[in-house]
Design a protein with these regions (language model features):
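Short, small-residue-biased leader/transition segments that mark boundaries at the very start
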Residues: 3-4
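Short hydrophobic beta-strand element within catalytic cores of glycosyltransferases
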Residues: 177-181
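Aromatic "clamp/platform" in nucleotide-sugar-dependent glycosyltransferases that forms part
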Residues: 160
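Conserved donor-binding/catalytic core segment of Leloir-type glycosyltransferases
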Residues: 34, 73-91, 97-100
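Nucleotide-activated donor-binding/catalytic signature segment of Leloir-type glycosyltransferases, i.e.
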Residues: 125-142
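Donor nucleotide-sugar binding/catalytic pocket of nucleotide-sugar-dependent glycosyltransferases
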Residues: 8, 28-70
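Membrane-proximal helix-turn-helix segments that form the acceptor-binding/catalytic region
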Residues: 14-33
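A charged, aromatic-enriched C-terminal amphipathic alpha-helix characteristic of glycosyltransferases
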Residues: 68, 208-211, 225-257
Length: 261
C-alpha cells in the first residue's frame, strides 16, 4: 500500500493556511470572501479557478483607513528618511540602518529616524554605535505619528512579507516617497514602481545581507539624486482609496449586496 502525503502546493494541489482551509473548502456556503488588498483578491481568485474550478465572490476591503490626507505645514526636511514598525527581526530595520550608512557616503546630508520599539532595539543601537552614525540615525521610540510622517521625504520598509502594512498606508497618506521589497502584499499595494518610489526585486534565499543592504542603499541614492518628480503627489493619489469615507462606502455596498442577493 502506498500513502501519499502532500506537504506543499503544486500544479494540482494547493496547501492553504490552516486558519482558512475549512472556509475555502466549503466556499459554496460562503456569500463573500473579503481580502485586505487587490493582490490578495487576484491571487485567491486564481487559486480557486485553478485548483477548485470555482469562482466565489471575493471583494477587497482594506483592514485599515485614514481619516484624511496629511500635508506638511512647512517644507519637508531635505534628504530625510523614516521608518515605523515594531523593532522585530522580521521587520529588518537593521538592514535599513546598514543601507543608510552605505548611502551616506554619497549623500552626506542624509538622515534616518526610526519609530518603534522591540526586541531588536539593542542590536540596532549597536550597529549605529559601531559605525558612529548617532548624528544622523536615531531611534525615536513610540510616538503619535499623525503629525510626524509629513516632516519626512522618504519612507522605507524592509519586511520580507506584509499582510497589509498599516504604516505604509499612513506614510502614503502623508505623501512620502516609498521604498520596499517587491513581496506580497503590503509594498506592491502602496508603491508604484518609478512613480512614488521603488519596489526592490530580491531573492532572499540567494542574496547575502551585504547584497540586500547594497540594493536598498542604491535605491536611496537613486531616489534622492534622480527619483520620481511627482512622488509625493502619487502617494497622495494612492492614499485616496484608503480614506475612511471610501472604506465605509465599500462596506455599505457589500452589505446591500448581501441583503438584496
Amino acid at each position: 500500500r502506498r500513502v501519499l502525503f502532500r506537504s506543499a502546493t503544486d500544479g494540482t494541489h494547493i496547501l492553504w493556511n490552516n486558519y482558512y482551509e475549512y472556509q475555502f473548502e466549503n466556499a459554496q456556503h460562503i456569500d463573500f470572501f473579503i481580502t485586505a488588498t487587490d493582490l490578495q483578491r487576484q491571487t485567491l481568485s486564481e487559486q480557486f479557478k485553478q485548483y477548485k474550478n470555482d469562482c466565489p465572490r471575493i471583494r477587497t476591503i482594506p483592514v485599515g483607513s485614514i481619516e484624511s490626507l496629511q500635508y506638511p505645514e512647512k517644507e519637508r526636511k531635505p534628504y530625510s528618511i523614516m521608518t515605523a514598525s515594531r523593532l522585530a527581526n522580521e521587520k529588518h530595520v537593521d538592514w535599513i540602518v546598514e543601507a543608510v550608512i552605505k548611502a551616506k557616503h554619497q549623500l552626506p546630508q542624509l538622515s534616518f529616524d526610526i519609530y518603534g520599539q522591540g526586541e531588536e532595539q539593542e542590536k540596532i543601537k549597536n550597529i549605529i554605535t559601531k559605525h558612529r552614525a548617532e548624528d544622523y540615525i536615531q531611534i525615536k521610540g513610540h510616538r503619535n505619528l499623525r503629525t510626524i510622517y509629513q516632516q519626512y521625504e522618504l519612507f522605507i520598509a524592509a519586511s520580507q512579507s506584509e499582510g497589509f502594512g498599516l504604516t505604509l498606508m499612513e506614510a502614503v497618506g502623508s505623501g512620502l516617497g516609498m521604498i520596499g521589497f517587491d513581496v506580497n502584499y503590503g509594498s506592491p499595494t502602496f508603491i508604484r514602481h518609478h512613480q512614488n518610489g521603488y519596489l526592490i526585486p530580491i531573492d532572499f534565499e540567494q542574496a547575502s545581507t551585504d547584497d540586500i543592504t547594497t540594493q536598498i542603499a542604491h535605491m536611496i541614492i537613486r531616489y534622492f539624486e534622480d527619483g520620481p518628480i511627482r512622488a509625493h503627489e502619487v502617494s497622495y493619489d494612492i492614499a485616496e482609496s484608503f480614506k475612511t469615507s471610501h472604506i465605509v462606502d465599500l462596506w455599505r455596498q457589500l452589505i446591500e449586496e448581501v441583503l438584496y442577493d
